[in-house]
């Protein structure tokens, strides 16, 4: 794929089986200032995909993006640190309020990673943010595991149904 809007690129990554697109996406995202904390233990975590969706796609697009970012920033990536405590329906057609309810308590830190997360600056990676409900639910789990701080990076921003254009 050459050119294309951010939305087209994300759609190709997620739904057309083009994980290699994570490379140029990570190149763009890696230029962001202020994400890494100098002197802190920085680590990247990806938003876990529902098992059925990952089986269907063959990969987790957020994990692929996180791995590419980790290589550029030269920090650890813990793509299996966060897990879904339950499967959640797709959020594409949900309102902001429905999204909050949909992902509430849907994530936790895998026990093997809790000690590593304690006191660390964790950077959550996802392909797109819409309302922030998923990011907030993941951050809640990361703070519960003892993270010192949590930041997030995404490649794109989407509008939720009913959002006014900006």
Can you describe what each PLM-predicted range is?
Residues 67, 71, 76, 80-166:
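PRPP/pyrophosphate-binding module of the type I phosphoribosyltransferase fold
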Residues 1-72, 92:
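Extended interfacial segments that mediate partner engagement and assembly in macromolecular machines
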């Amino acid at each position: 794929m050459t050119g294309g809007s951010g939305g087209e690129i994300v759609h190709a990554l997620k739904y057309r089986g083009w994980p290699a697109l994570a490379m140029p996406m990570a190149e763009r995202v890696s230029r962001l200032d202020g994400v890494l904390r100098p002197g802190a233990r920085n680590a990247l975590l990806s938003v876990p995909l529902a098992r059925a969706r990952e089986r269907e796609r063959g990969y987790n697009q957020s994990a692929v993006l996180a791995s590419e970012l980790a290589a550029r920033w030269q920090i650890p990536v813990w793509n299996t640190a966060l897990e879904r405590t339950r499967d959640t329906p797709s959020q594409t057609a949900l309102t902001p309020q429905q999204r909050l309810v949909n992902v509430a308590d849907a994530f936790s830190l895998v026990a093997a990673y809790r000690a590593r997360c304690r006191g660390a600056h964790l950077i959550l990676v996802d392909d797109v943010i819409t309302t922030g409900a998923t990011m907030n639910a993941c951050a809640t789990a990361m703070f519960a595991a003892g993270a010192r701080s949590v930041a997030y990076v995404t490649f794109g921003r989407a509008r939720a149904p009913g959002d006014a254009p900006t």
